[in-house]
Amino acid sequence: MDGVLLLNKPKGMTSHDCVAKVRRLLGVKKAGHTGTLDPNVSGVLPICLGKATRIAEFLTGTTKTYEGKVTLGAATTTEDADGDIIAARPVDRPIARAEIEAVFDSLTGEIEQTPPMYSAVKVGGKKLYEYARAGIEVERPTRRVTIYELELLDEREQFFGETVSFRFRVTCSKGTYVRTLAVMIGERLGYPAHMSDLIRTASGPFRLEDCVTFEDVERRAADGTADALLIPIERALFHLPKYEINDKVAEKVKNGALLRLPAFLEKLTGRSCLFRPSGKRWPCT
């Protein structure tokens, strides 16, 4: 069984647990996801099965789109709704739509983030959440990420209340912490904040409406039609530029030979996919 399963990950499960369950339901040995979702986040989780695990790295670096909710008035240990409140301040004035949109504009483009303590980023050989669980806060290296689009989804012109929540949509680069983005939004509006809800609606070319649930997988596995749920490897790579090579060159590529770049590929940037007339493809950088 080779291909990519687009799973609509439910809340309450780790991405690792989702892969393990798919492996068990479909009876496959090789499986891996293409980008971790936190347990309290649902949505698009592509899982590569069989030979498709070889292309996982070509799917992990794609842009991601999320829809979520920011809540102003309280900050938490985890930067989301699962953490303990560490700072609180009632929202003591109306928040105007134009003010939120101005903050969104200021956070669009390349920005610098500090990973949250409750994350899997490694510092000194240990994951940050291991320090956090031991009550230790360590200095974290910042990272540069790109926010391609940041849109306010609520239609209200004014937001009132001791706590204020509003929904947003963001398209961002790999490695972006959306919970940290929620905290940054709060800081620029002058209040402690956290991310109170999040769903991934797209991962690269894959959309939420194309995903299946565990119930779908179980039903198809039971009647022996689970293959129909998989996206073939060739289709999973359709977002990459395609270049045809002849069988002689293809064999050299297959064997890892170092080749002179053909003239028509000299201006190639980023990743691409080479294929031979028989249809076999090799993703490459």
From Swiss-Prot:
- Which residues are named in the active-site annotation? D38 (nucleophile)
Q: Name one GO biological process term.
A: tRNA pseudouridine synthesis
| Top-rank taxon | Bacteria
Top-rank EC class of the record's enzyme: isomerase
A Pfam family this chain is assigned to:
TruB_C_2
Does the record carry Hydrolase as a key word? no
Return the InterPro entries for the record: PsdUridine_synth_cat_dom_sf, PsdUridine_synth_N, tRNA_psdUridine_synth_TruB, TruB_C
Give GO MF terms, alphabetically.
Answer: RNA binding; tRNA pseudouridine(55) synthase activity
What reaction does this catalyse? uridine(55) in tRNA = pseudouridine(55) in tRNA
- Family annotation (Gene3D superfamilies): Pseudouridine synthase (3.30.2350.10)
Identify the EC number(s): 5.4.99.25
Q: Isomerase: present as a keyword of the record?
A: yes
Q: Could you list this entry's UniProt keywords, alphabetically sorted.
A: Isomerase, tRNA processing
Q: Which NCBIfam families match?
A: TruB
- Spell out the family assignment given in the record's similarity comment: Belongs to the pseudouridine synthase TruB family. Type 1 subfamily.
Q: Identify the HAMAP family for this entry.
A: TruB_bact
Q: What does this protein do?
A: Responsible for synthesis of pseudouridine from uracil-55 in the psi GC loop of transfer RNAs.
Checking PANTHER family in the record gives: PSEUDOURIDYLATE SYNTHASE TRUB1, TRNA-PSEUDOURIDINE SYNTHASE
Q: Tell me what this protein is called.
A: tRNA pseudouridine synthase B
Species of origin: Geobacillus kaustophilus (strain HTA426)
